[in-house]
Amino acid sequence: MDLAVELKEGILLVDKPQGRTSFSLIRALTKLIGVKKIGHAGTLDPFATGVMVMLIGRKFTRLSDILLFEDKEYEAIAHLGTTTDSYDCDGKVVGRSKKIPSLEEVLSAAEYFQGEIQQLPPMFSAKKVQGKKLYEYARKGLSIERHHSTVQVHLQITKYEYPLLHFVVSCSKGTYIRSIAHELGTMLGCGAYLEQLRRLRSGRFSIDECIDGNLLDHPDFDISPYLRDAHGNSL
C-alpha cells in the first residue's frame, strides 16, 4: 500500500455543522483525501450537530458494525405546544396546544425515560418495514404498521422555560431522540417536537475531540494530525 494512502487511514472525529447532511461530509472527505472507502458510526439529521465518527480505509470501515452498537449521548431542546409530522423542526406542523405544563408535570413525565423502554420509530425515519424505508411511505402520505423497539435511555432535564425544554440523554443504539421529544409532548398533553439536537458522545469519542466539519471543504486541509486508531489514540 502506498505510504501516502496508508497515512490517510484511521478514525476522524468530526463536529457536523447544522444544515449539512452526514453524507455531504463523507463526500467532502472523499474529495479531500482521494480515499473512496469511507464509512461512519452513525449519521445525524441535517438539523442536528455534533460527533460524527468517520472511518477511513478498509481496516477501519470494518469497525462500523461494532461502533454503531455503542451508546451515544445527546443534548436536546424540545419545543412544547406544537406537533410536527416528522417529530422535528423540519416537519409540517400538524397540531398546536395552549396547555402549559408545570415543571412538576415535566419532571414526572421525564421519569419514564429511565432504563429500558419501548419506542416506536417515527414515520419519517430510515427504519425499514417490508423492504422500504418508513420515510418512503410517509412522503406518499401513507401510514404503515410499525413495531416497538426496546432501547435503553437515561434522560435528565437541564432547563425548562416554556415552550423550550432542555434535556440530556444517554441511550443505546437505535434510539430516536425525536421520538422522545414527541412522547414527552404526548405525555404532557400539549404535544412537542425536537427543536435542536447535538451529539455529545459516540461510544468513547466525545465532542471535545472533534474538528469542525466545514474544514473538510478546504482543499489544503491536512487530516493526518487528527487521525486515531480504534482505541482513540493518535496515529
From Swiss-Prot:
Q: Does the keyword tRNA processing apply?
A: yes
Record-linked SUPFAM superfamilies: Pseudouridine synthase
Query: Pfam families attached here?
Result: TruB_C_2, TruB_N
Q: Which UniProt keywords apply?
A: Isomerase, tRNA processing
Can you tell which superkingdom this protein's organism belongs to? Bacteria
User: Which residues of this protein are catalytic?
Assistant: 45 (nucleophile)
Recorded catalytic reaction(s): these are: uridine(55) in tRNA = pseudouridine(55) in tRNA
- Record-linked NCBIfam families: TruB
- Protein family: Belongs to the pseudouridine synthase TruB family. Type 1 subfamily.
Alphabetized PANTHER family for the sequence: PSEUDOURIDYLATE SYNTHASE TRUB1, TRNA-PSEUDOURIDINE SYNTHASE
Name under which the protein is recorded: tRNA pseudouridine synthase B
Gene from which this protein is expressed: truB
